[in-house]
């Protein structure tokens, strides 16, 4: 196996859909593994160490939301949910549990691959860059965030969101702009992705999430970085 190939873990109990996903992803150069049971997914993530997890919400053993919550307790692996159009409440629950993005069924293979690639993109040769918002320090190439020497553990997506705000401290970002810059969307998308991840980011970087100083809301517009 080419060790440079990125591995996708597909967690879905629909054999035909899992087979289709495997064919599409392997055709795009990814390695894939398939698990059909939610409770087995946790073991598979530990053993296979995938670069990304495609996670169906409706699973036997343990549902996708619970799988997501447990994974997020100790892993920053990117998670993209697969969900039916009727699952709007579950979409929010999934995002609040730690999913980075979601794809509605039925989806076009190109759309799915675009979402996967957006979450896997990483610039391997980033120049040295240090940013700060208040007393929060961001070492961009090291993907490290600290406050007074104490490291703050963020998922890759939360890190990307914080960096986007910190790089342009005077700019107010609309949710649509953040969806394009951080999630890689090229068309209007679900702004709940932004709202939920701002909440998750604040829970980690703010001293008092109810009175944010690092990620500020500009009412009626969007979000911006707090004062330096």
From Swiss-Prot:
Pfam families: Response_reg, Trans_reg_C. Its main location: cytoplasm. It is found in: Cytoplasm. Residues 7-120 form the Response regulatory domain. Phosphorylated by MtrB. InterPro entries: CheY-like_superfamily, MtrA_REC, MtrAB_MtrA, OmpR/PhoB-type_DNA-bd, Sig_transdc_resp-reg_receiver, WalR-like, WH-like_DNA-bd_sf. Keywords: Cytoplasm, DNA-binding, Phosphoprotein, Transcription, Transcription regulation, Two-component regulatory system. CDD domains: REC_OmpR_MtrA-like, trans_reg_C. Residues 128-227 bind DNA. The modification 4-aspartylphosphate is found at residue 56. GO terms for molecular function: phosphorelay response regulator activity; transcription cis-regulatory region binding. GO terms for biological process: positive regulation of DNA-templated transcription. GO terms for cellular component: cytosol; protein-DNA complex. Member of the two-component regulatory system MtrA/MtrB, responding to environmental signals. Controls expression of a number of genes including dnaA, ripA, fbpB and probably itself. Probably plays a role in cell division. Probably a monomer when inactive, phosphorylation may permit it to oligomerize. The monomeric form does not seem to be phosphorylated. This is DNA-binding response regulator MtrA. It comes from Mycolicibacterium smegmatis (strain ATCC 700084 / mc(2)155) (Mycobacterium smegmatis).
């Amino acid at each position: 196996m080419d060790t440079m190939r990125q591995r996708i873990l597909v967690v879905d109990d629909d054999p035909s859909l899992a087979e289709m996903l495997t064919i599409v992803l392997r055709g795009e150069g990814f390695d894939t593994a398939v698990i059909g049971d939610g409770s087995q997914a946790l073991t598979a993530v530990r053993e296979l160490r995938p670069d990304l997890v495609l996670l169906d919400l409706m699973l036997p053993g343990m549902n996708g939301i619970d799988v997501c919550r447990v994974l997020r307790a100790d892993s920053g692996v990117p998670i993209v949910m697969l969900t039916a159009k009727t699952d709007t409440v579950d979409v929010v629950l999934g995002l609040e549990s730690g999913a980075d993005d979601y794809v509605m069924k039925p989806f076009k293979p190109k759309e799915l691959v675009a979402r996967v690639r957006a979450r896997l993109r990483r610039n391997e040769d980033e120049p040295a860059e240090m940013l700060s918002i208040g007393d929060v320090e961001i070492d961009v190439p090291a993907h490290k965030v600290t406050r007074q020497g104490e490291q703050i553990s963020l998922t890759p997506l939360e890190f990307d969101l914080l960096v986007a705000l910190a790089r342009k401290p005077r700019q107010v970002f609309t949710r649509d702009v953040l969806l394009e810059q951080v999630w890689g969307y090229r068309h209007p998308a679900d702004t709940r992705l932004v709202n939920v991840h701002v909440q998750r980011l604040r829970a980690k970087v703010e001293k008092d999430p109810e009175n944010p100083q690092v990620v500020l809301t500009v009412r009626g517009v969007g979000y911006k970085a707090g004062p330096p």
